[in-house]
Amino acid sequence: MIGKETVGEVNGDIELGPYDEGRVDENGVSIDPRTLETFLGSVVKKFSPNSVWQTVYGNLISKGEALKNVDITRQVLAFLSAKLGANLNAVLWSAKRNESGTKSKDLFNGFDTITKTEMDASKISADLKNMFTIEAISKDNAVDVLKEFYRAADPVLRETQTKLFIPQGVYDNYVDDYQATVGHVPYNTSFEKTFLESSNNRCELVPLANKAGSAFIHLTTKSNMLVGYGNGADKETILVEKHHPFKLDFVATMFFGAEFETISKERLLVGTIDGTTPVLAGIGG
């Protein structure tokens, strides 16, 4: 089951000019629509509170309906809920929808998957100026590669507060390269770089563990990264059910998905080697 919401960016222009009663601007205003798809996922996890309790205290605690209300059950449920969210976050970039799959990575299309799809459709490209070809990023060239990439962004994007989403290894290489390059320059007071050098503190570096092995880096605004969940009403539940005297079922159904609000050059610049090769040097041969 799929939930869909149309999002997008309004395009058009309007300008004041010298007073002229006869001048009328008839250029239209349009919306470039994009569809945020959320997919219904489900999981049933059977567990035994008594088994968990016995590993610590060596005795049983309860049975029947009372199992649902003991502290150890609440602790296990809190743990499972947190793991559910953590596993979705772990594949937020790399997930690829596979209806016959059983894992979080099969539930929805992540941002890297969407990026590759749009590249293959020529909607993200150098010609459209929302893509820039980069070299593999190593500790010897990271500063130059990221600065060149940032300077290739549209002027509108560059004057906006942006985030540069990169693998953790790319950030490590950037810090090492920065230290080796300007380590003794007086104005350098810290090697922990939060913003990209020469971006006037407009480009925040965002290293992500869930982008490991990625073929892309993304320069965009936080508001352009849409994550959809909820609003499934009666189809969405997180609950505990008891169908066995000593065991409980953790049952969860929810919608989840991701999308860019727009892929226009004013809001997004993608850096890649060839759309497939990991951007971090030394990965993938």
Give the location of each predicted region.
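Assembly/oligomerization interface modules of large self-assembling protein complexes
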Residues: 1-58
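Sequence/fold signature of self-assembling virion shell proteins
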Residues: 1-4, 10, 108-140, 171-285
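Helix N-cap / beta->alpha transition motif
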Residues: 46-53, 57, 166-170, 220-221, ...
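Short helix/loop capping segments that flank catalytic or ligand/cofactor-binding pockets
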Residues: 55, 89, 173-175
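Alpha-helical scaffold segments that mediate packing/assembly in large oligomeric complexes
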Residues: 58-145
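Amphipathic interfacial helices
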Residues: 146-147, 151, 155, 162-164
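Long, repeat-rich segments with strong aromatic
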Residues: 160-169, 173-175
